[in-house]
Amino acid sequence: MAAPMNGQVCVVTGASRGIGRGIALQLCKAGATVYITGRHLDTLRVVAQEAQSLGGQCVPVVCDSSQESEVRSLFEQVDREQQGRLDVLVNNAYAGVQTILNTRNKAFWETPASMWDDINNVGLRGHYFCSVYGARLMVPAGQGLIVVISSPGSLQYMFNVPYGVGKAACDKLAADCAHELRRHGVSCVSLWPGIVQTELLKEHMAKEEVLQDPVLKQFKSAFSSAETTELSGKCVVALATDPNILSLSGKVLPSCDLARRYGLRDVDGRPVQDYLSLSSVLSHVSGLGWLASYLPSFLRVPKWIIALYTSKF
């Protein structure tokens, strides 16, 4: 089996489950040495064992990415053990999902102000810390890739105020880091997965109360055809092995766009759902859902329309 990332060194934060786990599995399958982080060593070891069975090497490291001292220690370990080499950093760690589920349908003034920290400390704050220390290894080498996991919640209202602000800041983090890193040969991008079948969401979607909420009921129907966690991993591998990656630096990269660009399918063989297709967009618009089934899948929402729709001017 081809190992296109053999010899490369990667760090994936928040990899004990969910998207981070899926990314770690695919990076190891591609032959890389992958450092995975999380807060519980036992779950990290389970992922590491699974990842190594696919190829590559996987090193579990307990690290709370909201704590700068722990982030610094992580990258010092990578520096020491890999002779200063770091090829790919994936800023994925996120601890806000349960808070989002617990505060659903509540306005920002109806929730504790501390919800900001619950959603963005292990997330935006940690992503910045990791980017700082990761770049210190990449810049001297004149190469590297930083991937920030974000979402369309950065463009339009989604879930709550701290979530949207945090995701918008993630996209800006990637764009501004890319600006400063470009002359050093280091790329930085923002990756938008679609709806993803994470363990936590699977558990939540199985609850009976979901059927009583019209919004969640609609979400559940889309969830059955959602992306697996490993599709994001396939996207990261494709980006990391793209010789023209600098041309994408600073951009927001939806997973469905990357699937089209690199000819990717999900790990179970399914085609990747294109959430930027006209039919997909219309299926979520009240009164226009009937029209979606009549539109061919190749018709997509032009990016300039998205830019106009989300313009703040």
From Swiss-Prot:
It is an enzyme of class 1 (oxidoreductase). The active site is at 163 (proton acceptor). NAD(+) binds at residues 19, 64, 163, 167, 198. It comes from the Eukaryota. The keyword NAD applies. Detected in heart, liver, adrenal glands, and at low levels in skeletal muscle, kidney, pancreas and brain. Keywords: Acetylation, Endoplasmic reticulum, Methylation, NAD, Oxidoreductase. GO terms for cellular component: endoplasmic reticulum. The modification Omega-N-methylarginine is found at residue 21. May be attached to the ER membrane by its C-terminus segment. InterPro entries: NAD(P)-bd_dom_sf, SDR_fam. It is found in: Endoplasmic reticulum. Belongs to the short-chain dehydrogenases/reductases (SDR) family. Its main location: endoplasmic reticulum. Residues 235-313 are annotated as: Required for ER localization. The modification N-acetylalanine is found at residue 2. The keyword Protein biosynthesis does not apply. This is Dehydrogenase/reductase SDR family member 1. It comes from Homo sapiens. Substrate binds at residue 151. It catalyses: 17alpha-estradiol + NADP(+) = estrone + NADPH + H(+); testosterone + NADP(+) = androst-4-ene-3,17-dione + NADPH + H(+); prostaglandin E1 + NADPH + H(+) = prostaglandin F1 + NADP(+); isatin + NADPH + H(+) = 3-hydroxyindolin-2-one + NADP(+). Its EC number is 1.1.1.-. GO terms for molecular function: carbonyl reductase (NADPH) activity; estradiol 17-alpha-dehydrogenase [NAD(P)+] activity; oxidoreductase activity, acting on the CH-OH group of donors, NAD or NADP as acceptor; testosterone 17-beta-dehydrogenase (NADP+) activity. Disulfide bonds: none annotated.
